[in-house]
Amino acid sequence: SLAVDNHMICTVILNGKRFFLDGTEEYIALNDYAQRIQGKQVLIEDGQNHMIDKIPEFAAERNKVNMLHKVNITDDQLSGSAVLEYNGESKISVQSVYAAIKNDKKAKSLSDFARSGNDNIDVSNISNSDFNDRQKPLQLKFDFKANNQVTKTGNELYVVMDWEKDFN
């Protein structure tokens, strides 16, 4: 069917290496490829000849989100710092959403994003890497205070760590 074969990309051959450029991917890094075209066969026009190649495939690890939280418990309140790092498809998703937000709402949106929409979390000192740098991972750093995340029962503390509610 033509429906599966109607996506055009550009191939640049530089110093014997092939780079596949997809104009529909606004934030993708050079030498990185959207998951939807990875592993697909490509037909490359070369004057009167043609070449057949395949878009490289990457392991899921390439799209990893790293989250590092350093947490303190003081008076039944969590506080600390966090570093979130986005790679591959997850990075592109964050970049696309951020670019679509009006400039006067970007700071609030970053704050909402950092606290995962959880009203019990206050964030401050937010900093981020360059949203336009396609070659490096995207990082978001911030300090936080989390209310209503610690329950004390006798000598035991029960701590809510799944702020994004991934496991609900």
Positions of predicted regions on the chain:
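A sensor for short, sequence-defined functional sites
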Residues: 2-168
